[in-house]
Structures are given as structure tokens and as C-alpha cells.
């Protein structure tokens, strides 16, 4: 009370111009002081005074000061002019109070282009691009003279939605209205074209700009990083430095991210050189640079360097903890140890009194997914609800991914429905949830709903759907999605082209898959891996190995998926020596720990060439003795070579691991049957009957239109089964005539 009394007494005795000056300097003295500032009965402010208050609140982000000043203005009975109302509107937008801003905007008796620009800018900064676009159209219909800020909001919508057609139309309007030389707008256009994957147009604008600033460079660099380019961002940073421009933390962070794209020694060395340069400039501890450095070292598997950077930081906040936790989860194959370290960091930051952010929960949920710990994930979910973050779109996406991995699509749908802002990330996660659980029709339904909700699919959504089409042999649907990708410009993204390679290869069209591979301008390790695996599956072992060697020649470091493709190629080609060599190379030269798939492939390779004992010893010496898939690969080879001795041992081990799975019993029965040991084969049948094990029928499926039809032997469950069997019976009764003879008779 004493502070409030002294403040009132003091303010009542000073002139208005001095009062405004003091207001500007004393914003941070606390809520009671602000209340005293705005409420003295004998203090009158005119429009200029209120303008200073609103501008100060906007600059400092103090919505409390802004609201107090707004309330004081209402009580003063001042009739605000349009200029003052625009300052008030701008204050609410800058303070992210868009609800108040919209109410004020709707009630303003008069509005000009500045009014529209303030709210458009507020919407775009908060990610509400559709509302910004609606305001742009409203301003145009009102015949207001649109300026660079108005167009910037609309172009931001085009970039975020990857709407190239609309973006090019707006670009044309910018040129027609004489705004094409505005550096601010050129930067926005560069950013828009970059986000739409049209780097050639972005570069053309950049080259024609006579007054490039740091934002121009940053926009182009981040654009190349976004589409997966690695060399171009480094070249641009070097040119930026040669031109005498100060390197921004944003540019350095983007280029460090580029060094992570192709995880090869050359780029990592360049990243380390940039690290040294940032240390020289004193920027090493900048949060953007530090986060990018942690990410680079973690993705390269240099967790020791990342931990060292983290431990040397003089002060740690939520962002640095998030970066370090993410570092443990960046590997191709997240180990239980890495997940455990991520959990430890999460608990450590809480012990230090740091409140987890939505980003923290997102990465911790990723650790739960990697460790497949649904129960711990549910506990984290409860903590998220306690912190009132359950409606956050990023957390919603992470929860959907967790429940998808656990096969719980219903829980995933509930998380999706409770997300406050269903953006492209949450839509993509929900689609992925259905794809992972082999619900292709539901995935397509969601993809169509995505379009009807006026949200443009991004490159990851498109590549995900194309991969799903490849897995389910739905080539027609995949080609439709690729057509959309080409039309929207998304096909320029490396991830989309990679999915195209897999889709065409799985549909049997290797020439087209190879053509797409050749067209990729900046193939990454995923692109090479897709091509290697495709060639391997088609039996082109030598070609697959040539692609692998070419990848290494281009300086791209192989990952687990690339080596898996190589081992599959060796397996299908019977190249035992090469397969063993690459397996050792993966472990010793690249320090990549083989996973279950690698061991299974090597077991299959040894088994196919009759080295059954070696294959059995390999499983026993690995850490995958309890993994049925690996044993099943060996059991299949035992049947090929009619080895009932090893086959019996392997089958008994499988029966221990999967007592209710029929496959092991059937394979062992067939081994005995093929070996002529009929009595043992009958014993296996008796064992199946005693244990109540039934053979599951094999299924085939076909996609017609957007519907998947599955069939089993003697299946009567299909709604058109009667018609199908009638047609089959009719075809059986048809006497087929030699086509050549019929054709000859018709010609003569």
C-alpha cells in the first residue's frame, strides 16, 4: 500500500511528458506499480500518452501493462482515433492475445490497411495461416491498397501449405503492384518458394536481388536444408562470409543442420570446422548454435562430444535439456541404453526445478516409443495432462505415434481428437498410426479428410502415403498421390523421390524406379538405401553392391538400413564371402551395432548355402537368442536341406518362444515329411492337437479403387463370394481355344 500511495502522490505532481518518459522506463517494476501507473485519478493522458503505453507494452510483451492502459483509456472517456486503435491492436497481436485482438478488430468503427496488417502478422506469427489468408482476401475485397506486409502474410500461408499455384499467383500480383523490388517481400518470396520445394526459383530471386540482407541469405540456406541439400548451404555460408556479412546464429545453425543430412566424414569435418569458428566468434554458447552442435554430434554417433558440450555449458535451461535428450534418440536404432539415458536427463531437469516444455514431453514420448514401454508412456501422458499440455499439437503427435507402435489406434484417435490445433503433423501421425497397424483404407480416409480440412499435405505425409501404397501393392493410388506431389512441387523433396523408388520397385517396375533414382539431385543415405534394397529384392545383387560402393564414393556414410539392403542382396545372390565381409565392415569400420534384421539376414545367407551349423552358432553367439524371427529363418533352411537334427533343435526352441504359433510346428512337420520320417511328422501333428495349436490360413489381398479385398482358401466371408465362385465355376467349364489358331482363322 505504501508503494501505491507514494506512486500516486508522485505521478500527480509531474507533467504529462515526463510521465510518459517514466512510464517507458519503468515497465518492469511489477504489477502493483503498473496499476499505480495507470490509475491515478488526477492524471490525464491524451492519445499520445496512450500510444506510448501501448507501444511500450508491445515492445516489452507486457500484456498486463497493455490491458491496464486499455482499461484506463476506456474509463477516461477518450474517443480514440484510428491511429490509436491500430496501436492498441498491434499491442494485443505482439503480446499474442489474438482473441482480444480479433474482438477489437471486429468492433473498430473504421479500419485501414495497417489494421489488417497488424492482425495478419499476429496470425502468421502464431501459425494461424488460414485466418491470415481470410483477412488478406477481406482486405482485397474492401479495395484497400495492399502493401508488402499484407502480401507477406498471404505468402506465408502459401509457404506453410506448400500451395505453389497460389504462391505464384500472389507473386504475379506483387509484380503488377510494383512491389517486386522490396527486399522484405523478396525474402518472403524466397522463403515461400523454398518451402514449396522450388529452389531454382528461390535462387533466381536471390540472384536478382541487388540489396540482399541477412534474412535473404538465411531464407535461402534454410530452404536448401529443408529439401535435404548439404553442399549448397555450406557454399552459401562461405559466400556470405566472403561478401562481408556477419554470420547470424540462424545461418550457422542451419548449416550445422545441413552437416547432419549426409552423415559422412567430409561433412562432419566441415561441421567441426564451423564449431571451431563459432568458438572463435564467441557464439559457441548461443542456444541456437549449441542446439545445432549437439544435434550434429549426436546424429553422427559422437555422443561423447555432445555430452561434453552439454556438461561445459555454464547454465542449462529447458531448451538445452531438450537438445541433449533428443541427442540420445537420434540414432537409426535407438537402444534401451539410449532411452534410459534420455529418461535420466528428464528426471534430472525436474530435480533442478526446470518445468518440462511441450518439446520436452515430445522427445520423452519418443523414448517411450523406442523402448516400447507403454506403461511408462501412460505415466508421461498423465503428467502431460497434469501440466495441461494435452491439447498441444506436437505432444498430440508424439502420443499418437506411441499408441500406434503399441497397436492402440483407438487411443491414438482420442489423442488426435483432443488436440486443439490439428495441424499437418498431427494428421500425418494419425495416418501413420493406421498405416503401421495395416489399416490402409482408414489411412486413405484420413488422407482425404486432410484435403477437405484445407490443410495441404507436406512432403513427409506424401512420402508416407506412397510408402504405404508400395507396402500394400496399391500402385494406382500411389501414382495418384505422386501426381499430386508433382503438381504441388513436393516431388522435389528427396524423401518423396525415395518413396517413389520403393513404390515402383515393389510394383515390379525397376526401370522406372531407376529413372527416379537418377533424377534425384541430392540423394541421401535413405535414397541410396531404397535403391539398394529394391535391387536386392529383384535379385540384382551385383547392381545393389555397385550402388552401395557408389554411395561411399560420394562420401555418404552408410547406416543400418543401407547395410541391411546389402546383406539382402548378398543373401539373394548367394554371395556368402561378400556378405560376411560387409557384416564385419558394418561392425568394425562404421561402429554400427547389427540389429535383429541384420542377424536374421546373415543367418538366412548361411542357411541358403547349407552352412546350417554356422548359422546356428551365429544365433547362439548373438544377443538375439530369444528372437523367433532369427530362428525361423534357420528352420526354413533346415527344411530346404532336409536336416531334421538341427531342424528339431531349432523348432523346439521356437516352440518355447512361441508355444501357440503354428509356423514352427508346420515347418518341423514338413522337414520330417520331406526326409521320409513319417512317424515323427505324425508326432508333430499330435503335439499340435494336444496343445490346441491351429494353422492360421494364409491371406492374399487386392486393392480395387480405394478398398482392400482380402481372401483366404475356401473363403466365404467376402460379400461377393457367391458371385466370385460362380465366375470361377464358369471359367472352369470354358473350353479354351488356341489363341494363335483363332487369330489365324480370323485373318484368313
Curated annotation (Swiss-Prot):
Region (Type E motif): 630-705
Cellular component terms per the entry's GO annotation: mitochondrion
One of the GO biological process terms: mitochondrial RNA modification
UniProt cross-references to Gene3D superfamilies, sorted A to Z: Tetratricopeptide repeat domain
Region annotation Type E(+) motif: where it falls in the sequence: 706-736
InterPro entries for the chain: E_motif (IPR046848), Pentatricopeptide_rpt (IPR002885), PPR_At4g14850-like_plant (IPR046960), TPR-like_helical_dom_sf (IPR011990)
GO MF assignments: RNA binding
PPR repeats: 46-80, 81-111, 112-146, 147-181, 182-212, 213-247, 248-285, 286-316, 317-356, 357-391, 392-422, 423-457, 458-492, 493-523, 524-558, 559-589, 595-629
UniProt entry tagged with the keyword Protein transport: no
Keyword entries, A-Z: Repeat
Family, as annotated: Belongs to the PPR family. PCMP-E subfamily.
Designated name of the protein: Pentatricopeptide repeat-containing protein At3g13880
Amino acid at each position: 500500500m505504501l508503494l501505491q500511495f507514494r506512486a500516486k502522490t508522485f505521478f500527480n505532481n509531474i507533467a504529462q511528458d515526463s510521465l510518459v518518459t517514466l512510464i517507458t522506463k519503468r515497465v518492469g517494476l511489477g504489477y502493483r506499480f503498473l496499476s499505480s501507473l495507470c490509475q491515478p485519478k488526477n492524471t490525464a493522458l491524451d492519445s499520445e500518452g496512450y500510444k506510448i503505453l501501448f507501444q511500450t507494452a508491445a515492445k516489452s510483451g507486457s500484456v498486463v501493462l497493455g490491458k491496464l492502459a486499455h482499461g484506463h483509456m476506456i474509463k477516461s472517456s477518450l474517443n480514440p482515433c484510428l491511429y490509436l486503435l491500430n496501436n492498441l491492436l498491434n499491442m494485443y497481436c505482439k503480446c499474442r492475445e489474438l482473441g482480444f485482438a480479433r474482438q477489437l478488430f471486429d468492433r473498430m468503427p473504421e479500419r485501414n490497411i495497417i489494421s489488417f496488417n497488424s492482425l495478419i502478422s499476429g496470425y502468421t506469427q502464431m501459425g494461424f495461416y488460414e485466418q491470415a489468408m481470410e483477412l488478406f482476401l477481406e482486405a482485397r475485397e474492401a479495395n484497400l491498397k495492399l502493401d508488402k506486409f499484407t502480401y507477406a502474410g498471404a505468402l506465408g500461408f502459401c509457404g506453410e501449405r506448400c500451395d505453389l499455384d497460389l504462391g505464384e499467383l500472389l507473386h504475379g500480383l506483387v509484380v503488377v503492384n510494383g512491389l517486386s523490388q522490396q527486399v522484405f517481400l523478396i525474402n518472403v518470396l524466397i522463403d515461400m518458394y523454398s518451402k514449396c520445394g522450388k529452389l531454382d526459383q528461390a535462387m533466381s530471386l536471390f540472384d536478382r536481388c541487388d540489396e540482399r540482407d541477412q534474412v535473404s541469405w538465411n531464407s535461402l540456406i534454410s530452404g536448401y536444408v529443408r529439401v535435404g541439400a548439404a553442399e549448397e548451404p555450406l557454399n552459401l555460408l562461405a559466400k556470405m562470409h566472403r561478401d562481408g556479412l556477419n554470420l547470424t546464429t540462424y545461418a550457422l545453425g542451419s548449416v550445422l543442420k545441413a552437416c547432419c543430412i549426409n552423415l559422412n566424414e567430409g561433412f562432419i569435418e566441415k561441421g567441426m570446422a564451423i564449431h571451431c569458428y563459432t568458438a572463435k566468434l564467441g557464439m559457441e554458447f548461443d542456444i541456437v548454435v549449441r542446439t545445432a552442435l549437439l544435434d550434429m554430434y549426436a546424429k553422427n554417433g559422437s555422443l561423447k562430444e555432445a555430452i561434453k558440450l552439454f556438461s561445459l555449458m555454464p547454465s542449462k535451461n529447458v531448451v538445452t535439456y531438450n537438445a541433449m535428450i533428443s541427442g540420445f534418440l537420434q540414432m537409426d536404432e535407438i537402444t534401451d541404453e539410449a532411452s534410459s539415458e534420455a529418461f535420466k536427463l528428464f528426471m534430472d531437469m525436474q530435480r533442478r526445478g526446470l518445468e518440462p516444455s511441450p518439446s520436452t514431453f515430445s522427445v520423452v514420448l519418443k523414448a517411450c516409443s523406442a523402448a516400447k514401454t507403454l506403461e511408462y508412456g501412460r505415466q508421461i501422458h498423465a503428467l502431460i495432462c497434469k501440466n495441461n499440455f494435452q491439447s498441444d499439437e506436437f505432444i498430440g503427435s508424439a502420443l499418437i505415434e506411441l499408441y500406434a507402435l503399441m497397436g492402440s489406434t483407438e487411443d491414438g484417435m482420442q489423442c488426435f481428437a483432443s488436440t486443439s490445433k490439428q495441424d499437418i503433423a498431427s494428421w500425418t501421425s494419425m495416418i501413420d498410426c493406421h498405416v503401421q497397424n495395416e489399416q490402409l483404407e482408414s489411412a486413405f480416409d484420413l488422407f482425404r479428410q486432410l484435403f477437405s480440412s484445407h490443410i495441404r499435405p507436406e512432403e513427409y505425409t506424401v512420402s508416407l502415403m506412397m510408402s504405404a501404397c508400395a507396402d500394400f501393392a496399391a500402385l494406382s493410388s500411389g501414382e495418384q498421390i505422386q501426381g499430386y506431389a508433382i503438381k504441388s512441387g513436393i516431388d522435389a523433396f528427396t524423401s518423396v523421390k525415395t518413396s517413389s523408388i520403393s513404390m515402383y520397385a515393389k510394383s515390379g517396375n525397376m526401370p522406372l524406379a531407376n529413372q527416379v533414382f537418377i533424377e534425384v539431385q541430392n540423394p541421401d543415405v535413405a535414397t541410396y538405401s531404397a535403391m539398394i534394397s529394391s535391387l536386392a529384392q529383384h535379385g540384382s545383387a551385383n547392381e545393389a553392391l555397385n550402388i552401395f560402393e557408389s554411395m561411399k564414393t560420394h562420401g555418404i556414410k552408410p547406416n543400418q538400413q543401407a547395410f541391411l539392403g546389402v546383406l539382402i542382396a548378398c543373401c539373394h545372390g548367394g554371395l556368402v564371402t561378400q556378405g560376411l565381409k560387409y557384416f564385419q565392415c558394418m561392425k568394425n569400420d562404421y561402429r554400427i551395432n547389427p540389429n535383429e534384421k541384420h542377424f536374421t539376414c546373415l543367418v538366412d545367407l548361411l542357411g541358403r548355402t547349407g552352412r546350417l551349423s554356422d548359422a546356428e552358432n551365429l544365433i547362439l553367439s548373438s544377443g538375439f537368442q530369444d528372437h523367433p524371427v532369427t530362428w525361423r529363418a534357420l528352420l526354413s533352411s533346415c527344411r530346404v536341406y532336409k536336416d531334421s537334427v538341427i531342424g528339431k533343435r531349432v523348432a523346439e526352441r521356437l516352440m518355447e518362444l512361441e508355444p501357440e504359433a503354428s509356423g514352427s510346428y508346420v515347418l518341423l512337420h514338413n522337414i520330417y515329411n520331406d526326409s521320409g520320417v513319417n512317424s515323427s511328422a505324425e508326432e508333430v501333428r499330435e503335439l499340435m492337437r494336444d496343445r490346441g495349436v491351429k494353422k492360421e490360413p494364409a491371406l492374399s489381398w487386392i486393392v480395387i479403387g480405394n478398398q482392400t479385398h482380402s481372401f483366404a482358401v475356401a473363403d466365404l466371408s467376402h460379400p461377393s463370394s457367391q458371385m466370385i465362385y460362380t465366375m470361377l465355376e464358369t471359367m472352369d467349364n470354358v473350353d479354351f481355344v488356341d489363341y494363335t489358331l483363332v487369330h489365324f482363322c480370323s485373318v484368313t
